[in-house]
Amino acid sequence: MFSSAVVGDPATPVFRAYKNDPTYVRVLNSSDLGRVHTFGLTGHTWKYEFNDPNTSIINGQGGLNTSRAFNAAICAGSNTPLSFGASGLTPTCPSDGIAGDYLYNDRNLFLLPSGSWGLIRVHDAPMADLKPLP
């Protein structure tokens, strides 16, 4: 296992949030190849259609081929999907988030060596260089 404390952060993007922050991960495939990709994010789930209260809860989304995109609406550090309250407009998260590093990647594992992965770092204490959401 690798540790950022020992070897430093990866060269791939490290996105940052505080636990329980409502977070939107926009995933798209801009490739011109016909290969299909599957996005995954460890420790998190989201709604297949984020604005549909009756949709499936998933932890990976496939079918990403040429020019396809989707939004994963998550609560940072939580396995509970982002919800939008009674009004359907206000993003709400439970208070069960856990600070740590969460791997996002293409679940086609042969792409890991080429850098098709990164981290979402979830903090539980205020950081001087990361403003809290309003």
Language-model features: locations:
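Copper-binding active sites and cupredoxin-like electron-transfer domains
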Residues: M1-P134
